Each structure stands twice: as structure tokens, then as C-alpha cells.
From Swiss-Prot:
Biased amino acid composition, Basic and acidic residues: 444-460, 483-496
UniProt name for this protein: Cation channel sperm-associated protein 2
One cellular-component annotation, GO: sperm flagellum
Intramembrane ranges, chain numbering: 280-292
Acidic residues composition bias: residue spans: 390-418, 426-443
Activity modulation notes: Activated by intracellular alkalinization.
Main location: membrane
Membrane-protein topology: Multi-pass membrane protein
Amino acid sequence: MAHERGHLQLPRADAIRSKLIDTFSLIEHLQGLSQAVPRHTLREILDPACQKKLMLGDQEQLVRFSIRARRMGHITHAQRLLSRLRVRCGGRPPLSLWAGWVLDSSIFSNFIISLIFLNTFVLMVEIELMNSTNTSLWPLKLALEVTDWFILLSFIVEILLMWLASFFLFWKNAWSVFDFVVTMLSLLPEFVVLIGVSADSVWLQLLRVSRVLRSLKLFARFPQIKVILLALVRALKSMTFLLMLLLIFFYVFAVAGVYFFKEYSRSTIENLEYNMFFSDLLNSLVTVFILFTLDHWYAVLQDVWKVPEASRVFSSIYVILWLLLGSIIFRNIIVAMMVTNFQNIRNELHEEMTHLEVQYKADIFKRRIIQRRQQSESLRGTSQGKVSEDITETSEATDEEKSEAEESEEEKSEEEKSDVEKSDEEKNDEEKSDEEENDEEKSDVEKSDEEKNDEEKGYTEKVYSGRTFVERSYAERSFAGKAENEKVQKELKEKAYPGSPPNSSSHDEAFAADDTYLENLDWETLVHENLPGLMDMDQDDRVVWPRDSLFRYFELLESLQYNLEERKRLQEFAVQALMNFEDK
């Protein structure tokens, strides 16, 4: 079927095809091995007792391997490396495998986290002792300097281990690149001092301050902080155009402020506190941002009103309009978008967690089903053992009964010989008594035969109770399925002909009308009408399908997956065609 559909490959269709092959053993038929059908399962091979028995008795038989899909979690780089042929066939494990093992160990991770906290504490103490001239504190400063170098070297060793584990994956990970940049920025001032740059240089002081950025290495260590940062980045991405619009309004109001407050900025009146706020474009942008935060807006407005040349109306309109647009409207929009984005992220995480919970419950349910099957198989094995014991007991009982019957027959033959040797007179006199005794013996023999037959029937019923129970269960299931089908047909008949009695003379006509009704009935209505009855049925009942029907069912189900995929693509093509048509 997959070759008929071309290069299109669907996981569902492949799963259905594998199920079909597993059910009907098509691999053996295609390879000409239909006569060699596997008789044993993998469970029997794994069982030591069964394996020993099979190896002693039947070594050349095939084994059916039941391959099931297994959900794998996060596959680490070390696991990928272990599955490579070069590593598996090599004599010694590579250094990259050892480096990955060290990086993944909890001891090393906790050691790096403790160094990050220690680095924060050391920087805090160094800042406090920076301007101190007390000579008694020099050993403490030396210890802090040594600790700082030890922390820096530990971070460099960590980066080297990451490179040794996988150099290309290191540069593909954004958190690893961030870690590398922070470490190199803290290492750069030491090299600059070795080159000969003065320690009092401003750039060198800035580079030394960059050592504080080592505390940001915690972001890459805790997944919770990563989630918060990713949520912030995602929220800012969704607000890109809103921020662009806000920046445009910032620029417009900054330029307008330079023109509106020109007299105020050039005024010679003394005691003006904010006359430099609108002197040029940069100061005007800073002032607009201050007004955006609702800070000093009334003080600035009162200071502007001190200048008679500045219009009170235009200055008031400028400030109030910017407060309405920027501080009230834009700020609330930003807050609302941030809240909605965080809510969407939370809903997505909640859906993912519920999906994982449902998947976990489904796995537990599957395990219970497997345990139930194993228990049923063990019960069948015990019942078969009991049946074999009953068979041996009945065979021994029948042998004993046969020996007793032979002994009784020999005694009767001896008695008859002694009776023949008697005289004729005694025979004539005792004919009547003999006849009566013979009648009594016949009745006793018949009774004993009947009792033997009853006992044999009881034994046979005990012997074959297990087998007949299994056969009855299968027959009862098929009969129950037929009864359910007849019940559904009766309900459909009653819906189609509500006034007709069930036992009418025109049974054939009603049955023909029922067939026509089922043919004309829509599939969805048929399913909806029969769905309550199907839900009320016992879920343990199984319907046995014929082999050809089951094979056809799998084929149709596989073709349905391809048809659904083709329908989806046709819908996409139709949408694309309509969009192109509207563009033209």
C-alpha cells in the first residue's frame, strides 16, 4: 500500500501495516516460510524452566518476537555516543564520553552552583575592602584574590569539558555561549594587566565590574529561571509592533517638546529647576520618559508656568495628552499583553502537564491489562495441570474397576461348575430357586453396571470440565454476540415498525423491510442509535472476526489514513488557490 501511494509515509499507516503483518505472519509467507510458523514466544525463552525444556526437546523451532513501541525520555549526548559503532567496537571509551559523564553528574553540577554563590560573596567582600588601607587586611585580600582565581579556573575547566564532550553542540546552545561570554569578560582584565595597561584605566575598571556577571550563570543552571526568561522573551516578541509604535510617539513628543518649550529653555529667569529638560533632543527624550513614569510631571508644569513667554494652554495640553497616551493607554496595553502572554504560556504548560498525566495513566492501564493477561495465562496453566491430574486419577480408577470385575467373573464361573456337578433331582427341585436367584443377580448386575456408568460419567465430566468450560466460554461469547446483534435488529425493527407485534405471520416481509431500512439508514444515525447499547455492553466480551474480514479491515484502515492525508492536502491546495485568486 505504501508503494502504491508513492513517497508518502505516515506513522499511523505504518503502524497499521505492522499490525497486519504481525497478525497474519505475512513476512513468513512472502519469504516462502509459511510452513515454519513460530510456535514459541519470547516469554517462554526468557523463562529459565521453559527455556531448558525447549532446548532439550525442540531446538530448531522459530520464536515470535513481539516488538512494542517504547517511549523514550530525553536522550542525552552520552547515550547517542554509546550507540555509535566506533565507540562500541573500540577498545577504550573516548574522552568525550568521560567528559559528558562528569558534566552530567550531580556532584559536579552542585560544585559549580556553589562556586557561583561563593563568587557573589567574594565580590561583595572585595567591594567593601577596595578602598581600605589597613595593612592587617592584606592576608584577607590575598585569600579573596586566590579564591577569585580558583573560581575563574574552575569555570574555564567546565568550558573545556563542554568542548571535549561536544564542540559543535556547545556553540549551538545559547546558554553555553552566554556562559562562555561571561567567563571571558571576567578573564579579560587579567590579560590586559599583563600586557601593561594601567590598573587605574576606566576601561579596565569597567571590565573588572563585569565579574559581577558571573552571577548570571545561575540562569543556565535552574530550569525555573529559564522558563521565566523564555516567557519574557516570548512576551516581548509579541509586543514588537506595540513597542515600535510607542517609540514613534516618544520621538514625536520629544521633538514637539523642544519646539513648545523653547522659550522656557532659553529663559533667563532665576530659580528655574527644570529649564534644561527640553534644551535638546536627548534631554527631551529623557524628560518624556520621566513623564511616562508619572514622575515630576506637576513640578515640571509649575516650573514652566513661571515663564510668562511660555503658553500655559499648550504646555498643559502637551503634558496631559502625553500622560493620557503614554502613561495610561500604552502602559495598560503593555501590562495587559504581558498578562495575556503569561496566561497563554501557563495554559500551554498546563495542557502539556495534563497530557503527560493522561499518558502516565494510560501506561498504568496498559500495565494492568498486561498483568491481567499474565494472570489469566497462569490460571489456564493451572487448570490444564488439574485436568491432567484428573485424567491420571480416572485412568487409575478404571484399571482398578476392571480388575475387580474380572475377579467377580471368575468366582461366578467356579460357582456354575459346582452347580453342574449336582444331581438332576436337585436341579429340578432348585430350578425355581435358581431362576429367582438369577433374576436377582441380573438385577444386581444391571444396577452395578448403571452405577459404573454413572461413576464413569462423573469422572469424565470432571476430566473434561476445564476443556468444556473453555469451549463453552467461546461458544457463549459467540452466542452472546449473536444475541446482541439480534437485539439491535429487533430495536431497529421496532423503530421502523412500532405497531407490528414481534411474533407475526408476515415474518419474512418484515425481515425484508428491515434490510431495506438498514440499507437506507445513514451511517451516523446508525452509530448514534446503537451507541448506548454498545456502551452498556460488557467490555470484556470479544467479537471473533473471520480472517478475510479482519485482513480487509486492516487494509481499509490503512487506506483510510492515506485518504485523510490526501484530503488534508487537497484542502490546503484549495485554500492556497482561493488566496491566489483573491490576490489576482
